[in-house]
From Swiss-Prot:
This is Ankyrin repeat domain-containing protein M-T5. Substrate-specific adapter of SKP1-containing E3 ubiquitin-protein ligases which mediate the ubiquitination and subsequent proteasomal degradation of host target proteins including CDKN1B. Disappearance of host CDKN1B correlates with cell cycle progression through the G0/G1 checkpoint. Therefore, viruses in infected cells are protected from diverse innate host antiviral responses normally triggered by G0/G1 cell cycle arrest. ANK repeats lie at residues 32-63, 67-101, 105-137, 177-210, 250-279, 283-312. GO terms for biological process: symbiont-mediated perturbation of host cell cycle G0/G1 transition checkpoint; symbiont-mediated perturbation of host cell cycle progression; symbiont-mediated perturbation of host ubiquitin-like protein modification; symbiont-mediated suppression of host apoptosis. Interacts (via PRANC/F-box-like domain) with the SKP1 component of the host SCF ubiquitin ligase complex. Interacts (via N-terminus) with host AKT1. PROSITE patterns: ANK_REP_REGION. Keywords: ANK repeat, G0/G1 host cell cycle checkpoint dysregulation by virus, Host-virus interaction, Modulation of host cell cycle by virus, Modulation of host E3 ubiquitin ligases by virus, Modulation of host ubiquitin pathway by virus, Repeat, Ubl conjugation pathway. It comes from Myxoma virus (strain Lausanne). It holds the Pfam family PRANC. Signal peptide: none annotated.
């Protein structure tokens, strides 16, 4: 077996055999546009010792005319070598390999390095730049160093800094679609976007004007949502580029996609940021009916705490009405039973918020007749139960500025009703406030002493005075007095 056959076919290279063959055969002998030297550099078991043997026998470190590519580009592109490729590349450079020589296939050593995510570290890039490599080269795809690096799997801010500091441009567009570096990074790294890199690219002049940029940001956000990727800092960055209620060509908003893909974390984030759940897409859907269609109980409950428009209620109830109608026709009995709690929450909220009649949804009323009647009775009773011109309904559902302790007695009557969860929440807050109020009243009395003006005031007046303070004011005043 000759040197070419040994290097190309042997499962494991033995250095003693390789040394013997190199004494006989030319390491730069061209065969099918390849030399034994370049073939050796493509192997997974290429070592510095083996490379030293080739160099000792006179192998050309810049390759021979007619070969596929240069030895340095071969090593830098060989991902099978892992971190070993860095040591081999440095060995070639120390032996005289040209770091700026374009290989016969049009590639440059720096671009080969930046494509290889095993070795494209800031340290090695700095080494190449110190050895005189040019950062103004372009590959066969037209990309410069920054675009090439952005498309690799290992994008680190320190490496980008080294390239930009050496003069590499961040303004290279994508040759196929016209995306800039920032957009390419967002598209290529949906799961691993780093907000520091995004800010770095934006700070160095990447075009962020609307139009294509807004479309790319929105589409990237949709991909993140569909993959379940949540990064609050990256989302904050995206929403500096587009609106929280941005709509794509189909009139979908980001929160629409959260509901469609059941992405709870981004859904909660968008609601916190003030996303409008009532926006209607071109299919005529808003978030509430999409959540009902998906059977997502969590999202339905979260949405019902927001202000829902009558039309949004109508669409959601039409979904429920249709599902109940389909029980006998399509065997959906188990489906409706499984989502009964969700449907009841929707009905309960609709009866509370809307002046429209639930009876128009015939199948809903037939199926949930007792529950619907109970909701209506309790709603009407709460509206009729009035204390000091304020109804229990207004007190329980935040239609007055703040419930008072005097409302506890009449609120307690509705603890076991269909709106009991809301009433319990109000009562808990009132009891907590009463505890804070009582503590502050007693603390002021202790501070003033038995002969003070505060102590001589009637008890109900003392409590009325403190009751006008907000929770934060009560807390701050107590802390100051206690200190």
């Amino acid at each position: 077996m000759d040197l070419y056959g040994y290097v190309s076919c042997t499962p494991r290279i033995r250095h003693d055999v390789l040394d013997g063959l190199l004494n006989v055969y030319d390491p730069d002998e061209l065969c099918s546009r390849d030399t034994p030297f370049r073939l050796y550099l493509t192997r997974y078991d290429c070592t510095p010792e083996g490379l030293r043997l080739f160099l000792t026998r006179g192998a050309d470190v810049n390759g021979v005319r007619g070969s596929r590519t240069s030895p340095l580009c071969t090593v830098l592109s060989n991902k099978d070598l892992g971190n070993e490729a860095e040591a081999l590349a440095k060995q070639l450079i120390d032996a005289g390999a040209d770091v700026n020589a374009m290989a016969p296939d049009g590639r440059y050593p720096l671009l080969c390095l930046l494509e290889n995510d095993r070795i494209n570290t800031a340290r090695f890039v700095r080494y190449m730049i110190d050895r005189g490599t040019s950062v103004y080269v372009r590959g066969t795809d037209g990309y410069g160093p920054v675009q090439t690096y952005i498309h690799s799997k290992n994008v680190v801010l320190d490496t980008l800094r080294e390239l930009v500091r050496a003069g590499a441009t961040v303004h290279d567009p994508d040759k196929t679609y016209g995306f800039n570096v920032l957009q390419c990074y967002m598209i290529a790294h949906v799961r691993s976007s780093n907000v520091q890199i995004l800010r770095f690219l934006l700070r160095h002049g990447v075009d962020s004007s609307r139009g294509l940029h807004a479309t790319v940001m929105f589409n990237t956000l949709e991909r993140k949502i569909s993959h379940g990727v949540f990064n609050r800092k990256v989302l904050d960055f995206i929403f500096t580029q587009i609106s929280i209620n941005e709509q794509n060509s189909l009139d979908f908003t980001p929160i629409n996609y959260c509901v469609i893909h059941n992405d709870r974390r981004t859904f909660d984030y968008l609601l916190e940021r003030g996303a409008d759940p009532n926006v209607v897409n071109f299919l005529g859907n808003s978030c509430l009916d999409l959540a009902v269609l998906n059977g997502n109980k969590y999202m339905v409950h979260r949405l019902l705490r927001k202000t829902i428009t009558p039309d949004a209620y109508t669409r959601a109830l039409n979904v429920v009405n249709s599902n109940i109608y389909s029980i006998k026709s399509y065997g959906m009995s188990e489906f409706v039973k499984r989502h009964g709690t969700l449907y009841k929450a929707l009905i309960r909220s609709f009866v509370k918020d809307s002046d429209r009649e639930i009876f128009t949804y015939v199948h809903i009323y037939d199926y949930f007749r007792e529950f619907v009647d109970e909701c209506i009775r309790e709603r009407d009773a709460m509206k009729a139960d009035v204390l000091d011109a304020v109804s229990v309904f207004d007190t329980a559902f935040g239609l007055v500025a703040r419930p008072r302790w005097k409302h506890v007695r009449i609120l307690s009557k509705y603890v076991r009703g269909v709106y009991g969860d809301r009433v319990k929440k109000i009562l808990r807050s009132l009891h907590k406030r009463r505890f804070k109020t009582d503590r502050l009243v007693r603390r002021i009395a202790d501070l003033c002493g038995p002969d003070g003006l505060w102590t001589r005031l009637p008890v109900e007046v003392r409590y009325s005075v403190v009751d006008y303070l907000t929770d934060d004011e009560i807390h701050d005043l107590f802390v100051k007095i206690h200190a």
